[in-house]
Regions:
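A short helix->loop->beta-strand "cap" motif at the edges of active sites that frequently abuts
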Residues: 84-86, 113-116, 270-274
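NAD(P)-binding Rossmann-fold cofactor-contacting core
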Residues: 11-38
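A contiguous active-site-proximal alpha/beta segment in oxidoreductase catalytic domains
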Residues: 95-172
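Single conserved hydrophobic/aromatic residue that forms the stacking wall/gate
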Residues: 2-6, 10
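Rossmann-like dinucleotide-binding domain that binds NAD(P)(H)
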Residues: 169-287
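Extended hydrophobic secondary-structure segments that form protein cores and membrane-embedded regions
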Residues: 11-18, 44-49, 65-68, 118-122, ...
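C-terminal helical cap and adjacent loop that interface with cofactors, partners, or active-site loops
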Residues: 191, 196, 201, 213, ...
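Beta-loop-alpha module in the N-terminal Rossmann-like domain of NAD(P)-dependent dehydrogenases
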Residues: 41-89, 93-110
Length: 415
């Protein structure tokens, strides 16, 4: 984000409770400041008193607050920050239950009245695969029209598999203990689905406003737990015992984390299916996986990240069986040539059986760090120019209406 702009000294005023979260954050800043290539020059000013929120609000340093970490109080932090006159850039999720969602709607209304911006940190829009897929999605001569689908056969399907314990940049990823409490972290369908729903809104309904009261229906939602033993919990958190607040989730000495879920919903007549799975750790040489399918009348777009691809995301287009091979190939070539004007690195590889790889070289794919920088620049542009489109606000509310309604539906056992 801002801290990654070169040759700039950033005074980072950090307000947080003592614990793993703030320690990991400070270690990250140190690693950026000390790296060999393009080191940053952050100057840390840290406050870790119990009244960290009140201290931040009272100090009122600057005009932007970035909120991240424990999600249980995040919506309240958003509201208090807006009351205090801050623009807010918040890490997802902005709300994890219906009560949070109600407060979030009030926060957006207050921000509007005070000419302040509230922005959700959505990095996936800056992944080049998602950008190219969005372009292809609206090439009607190639893709056709996005199918409406049905609850039993959605036209858009997204599935992701994640892991609580894994190695990142050669180091084991240490989680704070509260990460295993769905009251603090949020259920799987309230958390990682935010990126997926945002992508669907952004790709399938570009520049369109989605009103959750009239354009959205949540059809079904389910959830189920991931079992975590004390040994696994200790390995992941470096804490020897389960904290008392997790006792209600423990059965036969095993922690049950309601991290998995599926939801089915409709936006403007398009039916969408989604599934999120959290395992404790990946298999040997394994990793996180992801599948996205969007069905058009002439072709289907797929993004796949799996073992076959070395856990690297790839974009494919597959023609419908009734579309002539030569006609489709000619249209695909024509479309790619048009896109190459803006994205000259694009190419196509025939993978047989009517499937084609839209090849994007690894060196043209920005890393996750650069995605954060892109979001920060977009947000700061909106702050400076006061020109954020209204669909950003409404579509974010629609997104959290979907997730929080799904959580409540899953709890009630609706299918």
């Amino acid at each position: 984000s801002i801290r990654r702009q070169r040759q700039m000294c950033i005074r980072d005023r950090i307000y947080a409770p003592e614990g793993t979260g703030v320690n990991q954050y400070l270690e990250s800043i140190d690693s950026y400041n000390q790296r060999a290539e393009s080191p940053t020059t952050w100057k840390k000013q840290v406050y870790t008193g119990d009244d960290y929120l009140q201290k931040m609000l009272a100090d009122h340093k600057g005009n932007v607050v970035v909120l991240a970490g424990n999600n249980q109080k995040k919506t309240r932090y958003i509201m208090e920050s807006i009351k205090a006159g801050y623009h807010v850039l918040a890490d997802k999720p902005l709300a994890i239950n219906p009560q949070d969602f109600k407060l979030l709607t009030e926060a957006y209304q207050l921000a509007k009245e005070k000419n302040l911006l509230l922005y959700d940190l959505m990095t996936e829009r800056y992944d080049i695969l998602n950008i190219i897929e969005k372009e292809l999605l609206h090439q009607t001569e190639l893709f056709g029209d996005l199918q409406k689908g049905s609850p039993d056969n959605p036209s858009v399907i997204m599935e992701s598999v994640h892991h609580f314990f894994k190695t990142v940049s050669g180091k084991p990823l240490i989680r704070p203990a509260w990460y295993y409490d769905v009251e603090q972290q949020g259920e799987g369908i309230a958390d990682v689905t935010t990126h997926l729903i945002d992508l669907i809104n952004w790709q399938c309904f570009p520049d369109e406003t989605i009103h959750y009261q009239s354009d959205v229906t949540v059809n079904a939602a389910k959830h189920w737990p991931t079992p975590i033993t004390l040994a696994e919990f200790s390995q992941s958190t470096q804490i020897d015992s389960f904290p008392a607040y997790l006792n209600r989730y423990i059965k036969n000495d095993v922690l049950e984390v309601m991290a998995n879920g599926s939801l089915n919903y409709t936006v403007k007549g398009i039916c969408i299916g989604m599934k999120v799975t959290w395992n404790y750790t990946p298999p040997t040489n394994g990793g996180d996986t992801f599948t996205s399918i969007k069905k058009g009348s002439k072709a289907t777009l797929k993004i796949v990240q799996d073992e076959k691809n070395g856990f690297v995301k790839e974009l494919y287009i597959q023609k419908e069986p009734d579309i002539d091979n030569r006609t489709f190939e000619a249209q695909l070539q024509k479309t790619v040539e048009q896109l190459q004007i803006t994205y000259p690195f694009l190419s196509v590889k025939n993978k047989k059986n009517g499937t084609y790889l839209i090849d994007i070289p690894q060196e043209k794919r920005l890393g996750h760090e650069e995605h954060f920088s892109k979001v920060a620049k977009a947000f700061l542009h909106y702050v400076h120019n006061q020109d954020m489109p209204e669909w950003e606000n409404e579509n974010t509310l629609a997104k959290y209406y979907i997730t929080t309604t799904a959580v409540e539906m899953a709890k009630k056992g609706n299918k």
